[in-house]
Amino acid sequence: MSWIILVIAGLLEVVWAVGLKYTHGFSRLTPSVITVTAMIVSMALLAWAMKSLPVGTAYAVWTGIGAVGAAITGIVLLGESANPMRLASLALIVLGIIGLKLSTH
């Protein structure tokens, strides 16, 4: 259950990371409320997952999901670069997340 909660927390990190772009420095109300809410819920779920997962593993997986998710969102929705080096780097992050999951009992 902790891993599911951690994945949800990571996905919410993507929401708030991408949401920051749409807040325009927190000058737009709706995107700002959505972004701050996603931040709070993401952090709360991360803390909950850390009750039974190693801190380093949980934090690395959370940030990894956020980084990969934000980059993929940027590529797919925002027209950001999808060059081979960037995609290979994202794949390495995903492999690292899988490795951390497999090495945690």
Swiss-Prot record:
Membrane disposition: Multi-pass membrane protein
Keywords, sorted A to Z: Cell inner membrane, Cell membrane, Ion transport, Membrane, Transmembrane, Transmembrane helix, Transport
Positions of transmembrane segments: 1-21, 29-49, 58-78, 82-102
Keyword Zinc: no
Cytoplasmic side: 22-28, 79-81
Compartments, record wording: Cell inner membrane
UniProt KW Transferase keyword: no
Induction of its expression: Transcriptionally regulated by guanidine, via a guanidine-sensing riboswitch.
Domain of life of the source: Bacteria
Periplasmic compartment spans: 50-57, 103-105
GO biological process: monoatomic ion transport; transmembrane transport; xenobiotic detoxification by transmembrane export across the plasma membrane
Primary location group: membrane
Single GO cellular component term: plasma membrane
Molecular-function GO term, any one: transmembrane transporter activity
Function description: Guanidinium ion exporter. Couples guanidinium export to the proton motive force, exchanging one guanidinium ion for two protons. Overexpression leads to resistance to a subset of toxic quaternary ammonium compounds such as cetylpyridinium, cetyldimethylethyl ammonium and cetrimide cations.
NCBIfam families xrefs: PRK11431.1
UniProt subunit comment: Homodimer. The subunits assemble with antiparallel topology.
PANTHER family the record matches: GUANIDINIUM EXPORTER, SMR FAMILY PROTON-DEPENDENT DRUG EFFLUX TRANSPORTER SUGE
Family of this protein: Belongs to the drug/metabolite transporter (DMT) superfamily. Small multidrug resistance (SMR) (TC 2.A.7.1) family. Gdx/SugE subfamily.
The protein, known as: Guanidinium exporter
Species: Escherichia coli (strain K12)
Name of the gene encoding the protein in the UniProt record: gdx
